[in-house]
């Protein structure tokens, strides 16, 4: 067995999954009734950074709907070091020289993406219908940026931890 995972930075192993100690979970529930109603619930990794839940349901030839939660971590680097002061923050300052990397600021590159959404569709009078969709995506953490150390190409570049905290809300209606 071969692995290129370095024990000093296991971020590739954890890039999109929460592998910390804890209980793993995976649930699938399905229900059907004689009146045509149905539901499906699927969930995994409850309470973890990579939690997923999906609830669908409806009534045949009448309506259907869905609610979902999808959390995805994206680890880019663990215990990274930078000579910049106050990292990670929106105010990055430097104090050079700092020859000893053990005194540099430590941080984790990565962000958490949380998507919550759903839809409802009424189709009782087929082919006529209406549908409402909505979701909200929250992203929080650090993304990688870069900057030149000067105006000459010989000065090199430095990676910057750029704080990210934004929310996107989407909605649609069709009939």
Where are these regions (language model features)?
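Residues on the lipid-exposed face of transmembrane beta-strands in outer-membrane beta-barrel proteins
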Residues: 27-31, 53-57, 118-122, 173-175
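Gram-negative outer-membrane beta-barrel proteins
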Residues: 4-9, 47-51, 61-63, 73-79, ...
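Residues that define the transmembrane beta-barrel architecture of outer-membrane proteins
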Residues: 20-25, 47-51, 110-116, 167-171
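Transmembrane beta-barrel strands of outer-membrane/channel proteins
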Residues: 1-3, 41-45, 57, 67-71, ...
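Extracellular loop and loop/strand-boundary signature of outer-membrane beta-barrel proteins
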Residues: 11-16, 38-40, 101-106, 117, ...
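Outer-envelope beta-barrel architecture signal
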Residues: 35-39, 51, 59-65, 114-116, ...
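Outer-membrane beta-barrel translocator domains and adjoining extracellular loop/strand segments
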Residues: 7-14, 52-56, 68-70, 78-84, ...
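Outer-membrane beta-barrel initiation region
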Residues: 1-35
